[in-house]
Amino acid sequence: MGKEKIHINIVVIGHVDSGKSTSTGHLIYKCGGIDKRTIEKFEKEAAEMGKGSFKYAWVLDKLKAERERGITIDIALWKFETSKYYVTIIDAPGHRDFIKNMITGTSQADCAVLIVAAGVGEFEAGISKNGQTREHALLAFTLGVKQLIVGVNKMDSTEPPYSQARFEEIQKEVSTYIKKIGYNPAAVAFVPISGWHGDNMLEASDKMSWFKGWKIERKDGNASGTTLLEALDAILPPSRPTDKPLRLPLQDVYKIGGIGTVPVGRVETGVLKPGMVVTFAPPNLTTEVKSVEMHHESLPEAVPGDNVGFNIKNVSVKEIRRGYVAGDSKNDPPKAAASFNAQVIILNHPGQINQGYAPVLDCHTAHIACKFNELIEKIDRRSGKKLEDNPKFVKSGDAAIVKLIPQKPMVVEPFSNYPPLGRFAVRDMRQTVAVGVIKAVDTKEISGKTTKAAEKAQKKK
């Protein structure tokens, strides 16, 4: 069998009509998990509806619709393989909660693929001041997605088709604006593609003989190639944070007859093993882990990325809930936050945000109202430089450092220590009004309970 391929996550971003669905659909279609029968079924439906020309996007639309109806269709459909990696597409904008998902996202993307349309007038629309392209790219960078690939799509609809001049014009302009955001254009592969016809997707196109391939320079090693698939292969593999202390935000807590209380969640950092003594914050409740399971099989240890259930002793299902975080009681255990400072970017708020504003924050699995207790400073959203102290208010487009106070017990961490617990979405009026990255946290000591099982386990050690 040989060694299993490394799993990586990508997020696909870009303007509505850039052809994200078609390009993504093409990759999944050609290298991916969609079985032939499903494809044939979709193709037949597409043809019957006169959508023959739309087949890749149609495949993706079907998947998306099923995903949104809450039917968890075989998630393998969102995966495809390159020669080096198993790639999972964790989300594609256009989903209603894209921004929220990207932030509280169950997984951090290792790389963003930005699709821009090269068609006449299309590129300009996507990148204009109010186009989504900038917003998505800024969001990806702010949330720590440091690798980027740019697919210049719809090369078949430039004037003349497959125009070298148009590709170079777009490459130049996109380079300028991703540089402003913080990406280094020299480390970004720019690939001229047609997601529809398949040019430079998996195989080099014979229509763009002028394209001598993409090159990237970075301190972790240079790379070059021709196709989008090769660019995905050149992504630097993520280092999964097993060496950090354990952080496991709870998604659910079950009571299982004959077993007892079983919290479920995804290991974000560190490892979880049977026999470990864990502390749940905010209530500061300490107990022993009896067993750890994934897909109904017991595990000797769970590592970052694993979605697990674990059985704990002497704790009732009423004492812990979704949004709580488990950690190793002997190694920097999580604590309740009294307040925290964060850098926020206001995305779409119809009015002004003043001191005292108390929207709901979505951070990891927690969903808790937090008060903007102090607007500390307004900053330039690209450079981070201070613009003014103690602004009276902030509005859409602004970035600021603010002090937030959770209105109920909550666990958050500085982004620099534990990224998945250090980014959040601010939700109000049924939309994401702001995103934030946590800079510093003031914790509070809560005297919690330690179960008998934990005391016994600690004595044994």
UniProtKB/Swiss-Prot annotation:
Q: Give me the ranges of the annotated region G3.
A: 91-94
Q: Which CDD domains match?
A: EF1_alpha (cd01883), EF1_alpha_II (cd03693), EF1_alpha_III (cd03705)
Protein residues bound to GTP: 14-21, 153-156, 194-196
Which parts of the sequence carry 5-glutamyl glycerylphosphorylethanolamine? E301, E374
Give one Pfam hit by family name. GTP_EFTU_D2
Q: Which InterPro entries does the record cross-reference, listed alphabetically?
A: EFTu-like_2 (IPR004161), G_TR_CS (IPR031157), GTP-eEF1A_C (IPR054696), P-loop_NTPase (IPR027417), T_Tr_GTP-bd_dom (IPR000795), TRAFAC_GTPase_members (IPR050100), Transl_B-barrel_sf (IPR009000), Transl_elong_EF1A/Init_IF2_C (IPR009001)
Show the GO cellular component annotation of the record.
Answer: cytoplasm
Region (G2) spans which residues?
70-74
What molecular function terms (GO) are annotated for this protein? GTP binding; GTPase activity; translation elongation factor activity
Q: Which reaction does it catalyse?
A: GTP + H2O = GDP + phosphate + H(+)
Region described as G1: spans on this chain:
14-21
Q: What is its main location?
A: cytoplasm
Q: Per the database record, which ranges form the tr-type G domain?
A: 5-242
Q: Give the matching PROSITE patterns.
A: G_TR_1, G_TR_2
Q: What is its EC number?
A: 3.6.5.-
What enzyme category does the UniProt record give?
hydrolase
Q: Which sequence positions carry the modification called N,N,N-trimethylglycine?
A: G2
Per the record, which residues fall in region G5? 194-196
| Sequence segments annotated as region (G4) | 153-156
The compartments listed are:
Cytoplasm
Q: Which NCBIfam families match?
A: EF-1_alpha, PRK12317.1
What this chain does, per the entry, is described as: Translation elongation factor that catalyzes the GTP-dependent binding of aminoacyl-tRNA (aa-tRNA) to the A-site of ribosomes during the elongation phase of protein synthesis. Base pairing between the mRNA codon and the aa-tRNA anticodon promotes GTP hydrolysis, releasing the aa-tRNA from EEF1A1 and allowing its accommodation into the ribosome. The growing protein chain is subsequently transferred from the P-site peptidyl tRNA to the A-site aa-tRNA, extending it by one amino acid through ribosome-catalyzed peptide bond formation.
Q: Which family does it belong to?
A: Belongs to the TRAFAC class translation factor GTPase superfamily. Classic translation factor GTPase family. EF-Tu/EF-1A subfamily.
- Put simply, this protein is called Elongation factor 1-alpha
Which source organism does the UniProt entry give?
Answer: Oryzias latipes (Japanese rice fish)
